[in-house]
């Protein structure tokens, strides 16, 4: 794990003992800090019994603490801890800020910080894969992979300095203040998480803060999309140099990247390539990484081809903006619409405007969940709609209707919480359903 002398003798309260919170506690204790930990779950508290103080930070005096470390899921806009900590003069931070404070004691390294409404995980995993394929010592963390404080410190090797590649949500950025990055990237920005922010401008301001967390030789990569330029200009303080990344993109080699299809993955690949260039990788090393990238579960994941029908698990698409590129990835051929689209769940918006430009690629929509009726009304003027309610029914109908060369795709454009614990369970369930329905079919 990552430890630091900077934590020794200091006093921390930790709220939330899931993966990142527990890793923070372990690191702080190993570093010689005094820790008071709390979680609503009995088993999480019991796991630390006898090793540190167990108390709810809302029930203790915070004066004298050096920081309160909270999990990103704690809604600071509504949680009373925010006011209590402020009154006590105690900062509220996250595990990424702990990593930031440990940076000066780590072997010389680079940090990459990647954010955006959509594409963060793919771009983070892609940068990590390209670096690893090139022989660079690297780990990925933040909103993906193992908690960063649970990772072992990286050492330089004959390929150069090691690289920590961090996927950072707006919630994590809100809890981070001193991170020093060699490169930061804001991939895109569209309205999301508005239950945590006063308005879109506040959400954009959170994202833009990452652009100013640079080391003295760092660079920020920014998108040229119209919806991103205004908020970036308003909130990015231009601490370091920056580059604008935008279309037209060169797609001439995209056919060689099987796990990076669609316009959104082309954009992810362009950002990843620029980031790796800033880390001194050669064009050849970057090209090899793009060709060999295996993809991530639930993100345009190819489950197989059955009787000529390609099945795609894009359960991570929890809003219309993230579904739109998936609908664009398989355009109609000679007038034949190829996509059988399974959509619905817990809607984040009352429209599908961002998907509308690609409705011409969809043969039929199979609506599920709480948003099924709304989506049916929105889509009926543009395509055949089959109300299904449940994912198993939608999958069966879509597979039955699809012809060789077609695509059956779960890309819900919705959150999962009406029927599933999270998007991962939804995607895993889809995979299981497809497996059962295609047992007797040839897969390729």
Walk through the language-model features, giving the residues of each:
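Phosphate-binding loop of NTP-binding sites
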Residues: 11, 29, 61-63, 72, ...
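C-terminal helical cap/extension that packs against the catalytic core
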Residues: 352-406, 442-443
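Nucleotide phosphate-binding/pyrophosphate-handling subdomain across enzymes
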Residues: 3-12, 21-31, 257-362, 377
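Residues in the short beta-alpha loop(s) of Rossmann-like NAD(P)-binding domains
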Residues: 18, 41, 144, 225-226, ...
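Short beta-strand "acidic-cap" motif of Rossmann-like dinucleotide-binding folds
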Residues: 35-39, 139-140, 165, 410
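Short internal beta-strands
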Residues: 34-40, 220-224, 342-343, 360-370
């Amino acid at each position: 794990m990552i430890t630091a002398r900077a934590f020794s003798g200091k006093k921390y309260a930790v709220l939330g003992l899931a993966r990142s919170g527990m890793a923070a506690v372990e690191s702080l204790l190993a570093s010689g800090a005094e820790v008071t930990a709390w979680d609503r779950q009995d088993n999480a508290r019991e796991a630390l019994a006898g090793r540190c103080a167990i108390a709810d930070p809302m029930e203790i005096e915070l004066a004298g603490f050096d920081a309160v470390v909270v999990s990103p899921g704690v809604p600071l806009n509504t949680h009373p801890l925010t006011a209590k900590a402020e009154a006590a003069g105690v900062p509220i931070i996250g595990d990424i800020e702990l990593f930031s404070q440990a940076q000066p004691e780590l072997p010389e390294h680079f940090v990459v910080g990647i954010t955006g409404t959509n594409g963060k995980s793919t771009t983070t995993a892609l940068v990590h894969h390209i670096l690893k394929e090139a022989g660079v010592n690297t780990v990925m963390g933040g909103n993906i992979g193992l908690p960063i404080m649970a990772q072992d410190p990286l050492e330089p090797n004959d390929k150069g300095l090691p690289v920590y590649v961090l996927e950072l949500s707006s919630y994590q950025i809100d809890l981070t203040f001193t991170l020093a990055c060699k490169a930061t990237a804001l991939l895109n920005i569209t309205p999301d998480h508005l239950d945590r922010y006063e308005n879109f401008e506040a959400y954009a301001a959170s994202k833009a803060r990452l652009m100013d967390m640079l080391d003295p030789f760092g660079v920020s990569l920014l998108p040229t999309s119209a919806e991103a330029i205004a908020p970036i200009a308003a909130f990015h303080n231009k601490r370091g140099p920056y580059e604008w990344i935008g279309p037209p993109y060169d797609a001439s080699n995209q056919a060689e990247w099987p796990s990076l299809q669609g316009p959104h993955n082309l954009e992810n690949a362009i950002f990843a390539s620029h980031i790796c260039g800033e880390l001194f990788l050669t064009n050849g090393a970057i090209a090899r990484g793009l060709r060999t990238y295996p993809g991530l579960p639930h993100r345009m994941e190819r489950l197989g081809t059955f009787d000529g029908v390609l099945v795609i698990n894009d359960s991570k698409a929890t809003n219309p903006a993230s579904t739109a590129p998936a609908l664009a990835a398989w355009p109609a051929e000679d007038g034949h619409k190829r996509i059988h689209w399974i959509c619905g769940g817990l809607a984040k918006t009352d429209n599908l405007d961002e998907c509308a430009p690609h409705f011409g690629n969809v043969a039929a929509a199979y609506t599920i969940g709480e948003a099924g009726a709304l989506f049916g009304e929105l889509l009926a003027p543009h395509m055949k709609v089959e109300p299904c309610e449940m994912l198993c029914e939608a999958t069966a109908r879509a597979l039955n209707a699809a012809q060789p060369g077609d695509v059956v795709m779960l890309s819900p454009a919705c959150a999962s919480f009406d029927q599933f614990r999270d998007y991962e369970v939804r995607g895993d369930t889809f995979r299981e359903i497809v497996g059962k329905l295609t047992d007797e079919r040839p897969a390729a």
